[in-house]
Every structure is written in structure tokens, then in C-alpha cells.
């Protein structure tokens, strides 16, 4: 097999796509491979990490049902394709890996045009349109969950990606229980509105309750904090947390959307969760949540249309019951031990 010296990662959009790509990058860097990220919206997730080589390129979705949006998306897609084609010609990679979302389209199209071997990584149990379509042109798909394999038209195998780094251990002295609330990388208004009020209802049952609430980039930090303050709940409210693993490890319960990255990290640290799937995006988060709650047994799911202060507070009290929490942690440990530990790099080497 020819030695792999350079890899392009086609990625962009939300954390569900970008965070796995950054994890894959770490794996390849460890193998002395030069990595270039091509996509849109990367800067927000990189923070001050100047070591990551990336280039923001235009992208647009050609999948809109509205004619004007479809043409606008196609125009941006073409601009991104031209830019990606030039970057790929300059970088001369040995292969490219797409991580889903229409933001990865320009770089994947440019890779195919340049006759560079293409691989995909799928984070969800139900793949999106882009990965399903491009699996016809790919040499292989590495999946976070084996159940996704039935949707692809090429070799597909469950692989392991390292989770986000622990920058420092987090401790909340005297706090018990600790609840982490996460609305996803884009935030979730309904979680920011309902969850604080629901947790205020259980304050009398848990005098030492501590809440770490990540509201997302558009969340109203002051409004969310005010609800906790009025209820006498010790708390931290932040827009984003670069030490997500540290927060999860310090938590007794997580209330979150059910993106694939979150599910992987929950399984890794074995922290039970109450999942409120995002109702859009072809329902993939609901499938993720059903897998986590029904197949794994790691928590409960509340569909957004049924999310109320009352329904959530009841589930929180159930989740914090010591026996329930312990059973869920054991179930998550069992599921994690059954997952594949073959790396994406190893899978690619076997497929070339």
C-alpha cells in the first residue's frame, strides 16, 4: 500500500460534523500525516488552536424545494467547488474524507474531479442525504454506529474516533447532583426556556443541586441565569464549553439534544441522559435517541412536542434515583465495551 502523506477532510456546518473531523485529524497527525480541513464554519470550533490547517470555502445546499434557494445554493456550491479544486491541486492529498452535510460537498466534488480516493465518515444511525449519495463514489464508509451500514452502497464498518480532549478535570465542590444541560452546538431555544423552569421545580428535593447550562451561541445567558438565581440553584451559564469532556465527567445527569457526537461522548463517560431530539433533519436525532434509550438503556427520551416543565421534572427525579442511575451507567458501560476499536485510519488502510 502506498504511504499516506496528506489527507483532506471535507467538513463544515454543525459540531456534529466538525467535532468528529477534528478527532479524526488528531488520529492522522499521530501517524505523521499532514491534514487540511476544507469547509465552512470551522473557525468557531477551533478556538485559539492555530495548529489546525483549514480553509473556509463557500458552500450551498442544492436540496431546497424552493427554486430561488436551490439556484442560490447551487451558485454557492459551484464557487466552493472551484475554490476547493484549487486548494486540492495545491495541497496534492493522497485521499479525502467527507464528514457529511452540504458544507462538505465542494471539497468532495473537487476530490472526485481530481480522481483522489474518497472515504466517508457517518456519525448518525440514519445517514444524511450527502453521505448516502456519495457512498456510490466512495471506497468505504467508517461509521460511529454499525446500524448505519444498511444505508450505504460500498464497504461500511464501525470505527472508533477519539473523543474531545480533556483540557482539565472539573470539580464542583459540595454539589450533588450536578446536571449538565446542552442544546447542541447551535443551541436550542426550547431547552433554554423549559429546562431551567423544570429544574426549579425539583430544587426543594436537592438543596445542593448544581446546573452547568450551555445555551449555545444565540442563547440568552442573562435570562437563563436569572431563572436559576430566582430558584436558588447554584449554576454556570455559558454559550460554549471547549472542555466538554470535563463537564460530562463531572455530571450526574445530562439533558441534551441527541446528536451523534453527544451520544458517543455519553457512552464514553457513562453518564445517563434525558434526550430531547431535534425534530427536523429527517428525524435522525430521534433515531439516535431511541437507540440510546431503548437499545442501550442509557436514559429516557422526551419528544420536543411533549416537552413541558412537568414532564421533564418528573423524568429528572426518576433519573436521579440512585438505583435507576446505577442501572443506566452499567447498561452504557456494557454497550461501550461492545463497540469497535478499529480506528478510521486502520479502516482506510485496509480499504485502499
Curated annotation (Swiss-Prot):
UniProt GO molecular function: glycosyltransferase activity; UDP-N-acetyl-D-glucosamine:N-acetylmuramoyl-L-alanyl-D-glutamyl-meso-2,6-diaminopimelyl-D-alanyl-D-alanine-diphosphoundecaprenol 4-beta-N-acetylglucosaminlytransferase activity; undecaprenyldiphospho-muramoylpentapeptide beta-N-acetylglucosaminyltransferase activity
GO terms under cellular component: plasma membrane
Primary location recorded for the protein, binned into one broad class: membrane
Membrane topology type: Peripheral membrane protein
InterPro entries named among the record's database cross-references: GlcNAc_MurG, Glyco_trans_28_C, GlycoTrans_28_N
Binding site for UDP-N-acetyl-alpha-D-glucosamine: 14-16, 124, 164, 185, 285
This enzyme's EC code(s): 2.4.1.227
The protein's annotated pathway: Cell wall biogenesis; peptidoglycan biosynthesis
GO biological process per UniProt: carbohydrate metabolic process; cell division; cell wall organization; lipid glycosylation; peptidoglycan biosynthetic process; regulation of cell shape
Top-tier EC class: transferase
Catalytic activity: di-trans,octa-cis-undecaprenyl diphospho-N-acetyl-alpha-D-muramoyl-L-alanyl-D-glutamyl-meso-2,6-diaminopimeloyl-D-alanyl-D-alanine + UDP-N-acetyl-alpha-D-glucosamine = di-trans,octa-cis-undecaprenyl diphospho-[N-acetyl-alpha-D-glucosaminyl-(1->4)]-N-acetyl-alpha-D-muramoyl-L-alanyl-D-glutamyl-meso-2,6-diaminopimeloyl-D-alanyl-D-alanine + UDP + H(+)
Subcellular location: Cell inner membrane
Similarity section: Belongs to the glycosyltransferase 28 family. MurG subfamily.
PANTHER family: GLYCOSYLTRANSFERASE, UDP-N-ACETYLGLUCOSAMINE--N-ACETYLMURAMYL-(PENTAPEPTIDE) PYROPHOSPHORYL-UNDECAPRENOL N-ACETYLGLUCOSAMINE TRANSFERASE 1
Task of the protein: Cell wall formation. Catalyzes the transfer of a GlcNAc subunit on undecaprenyl-pyrophosphoryl-MurNAc-pentapeptide (lipid intermediate I) to form undecaprenyl-pyrophosphoryl-MurNAc-(pentapeptide)GlcNAc (lipid intermediate II).
Cross-referenced NCBIfam families: murG
Identification of the protein by name: UDP-N-acetylglucosamine--N-acetylmuramyl-(pentapeptide) pyrophosphoryl-undecaprenol N-acetylglucosamine transferase
Organism listed in the record: Chlamydia trachomatis serovar D (strain ATCC VR-885 / DSM 19411 / UW-3/Cx)
Amino acid at each position: 500500500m502506498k504511504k499516506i502523506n496528506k489527507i483532506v477532510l471535507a467538513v463544515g456546518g454543525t459540531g456534529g460534523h466538525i467535532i468528529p473531523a477534528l478527532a479524526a485529524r488528531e488520529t492522522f497527525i499521530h501517524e505523521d500525516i499532514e491534514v487540511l480541513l476544507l469547509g465552512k464554519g470551522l473557525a468557531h470550533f477551533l478556538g485559539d488552536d492555530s495548529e489546525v490547517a483549514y480553509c473556509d470555502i463557500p458552500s450551498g445546499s442544492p436540496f431546497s424545494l424552493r427554486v430561488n434557494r436551490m439556484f442560490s445554493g447551487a451558485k454557492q456550491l459551484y464557487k466552493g467547488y472551484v475554490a476547493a479544486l484549487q486548494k486540492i491541486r495545491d495541497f496534492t492529498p493522497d485521499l479525502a474524507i467527507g464528514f457529511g452535510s452540504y458544507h462538505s460537498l465542494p471539497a468532495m466534488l473537487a476530490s472526485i474531479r481530481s480522481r483522489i480516493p474518497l472515504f466517508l465518515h457517518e456519525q448518525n444511525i440514519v445517514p444524511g442525504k450527502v453521505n448516502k449519495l456519495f457512498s456510490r463514489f466512495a471506497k468505504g464508509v467508517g461509521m460511529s454506529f454499525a446500524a448505519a451500514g444498511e444505508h450505504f452502497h460500498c464497504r461500511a464498518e464501525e470505527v472508533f474516533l477519539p473523543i474531545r480532549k480533556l483540557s482539565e478535570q472539573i470539580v464542583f465542590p459540595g454539589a450533588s447532583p450536578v446536571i449538565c444541560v446542552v442544546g447542541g452546538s447551535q443551541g436550542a431555544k426550547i431547552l433554554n426556556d423549559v429546562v431551567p423552569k423544570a429544574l426549579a421545580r425539583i430544587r426543594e428535593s436537592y438543596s445542593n443541586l448544581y446546573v452547568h447550562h450551555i445555551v449555545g451561541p444565540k442563547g440568552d445567558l442573562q435570562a437563563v441565569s436569572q431563572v436559576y438565581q430566582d430558584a436558588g440553584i447554584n449554576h454556570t451559564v455559558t454559550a460554549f464549553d471547549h472542555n466538554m469532556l470535563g463537564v460530562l465527567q463531572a455530571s450526574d445527569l445530562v439533558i441534551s439534544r441527541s446528536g451523534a457526537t453527544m451520544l458517543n461522548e455519553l457512552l464514553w463517560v457513562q453518564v445517563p441522559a434525558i434526550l430531547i431530539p431535534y425534530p427536523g433533519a429527517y428525524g435522525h436525532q430521534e433515531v439516535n435517541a431511541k437507540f440510546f434509550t431503548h437499545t442501550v438503556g442509557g436514559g429516557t427520551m422526551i419528544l420536543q412536542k411533549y416537552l413541558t416543565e412537568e414532564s421533564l421534572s418528573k423524568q429528572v427525579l426518576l433519573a436521579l434515583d440512585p438505583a435507576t442511575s446505577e442501572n443506566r451507567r452499567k447498561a452504557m458501560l456494557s454497550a461501550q465495551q461492545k463497540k469497535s476499536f478499529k480506528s478510521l485510519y486502520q479502516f482506510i488502510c485496509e480499504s485502499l
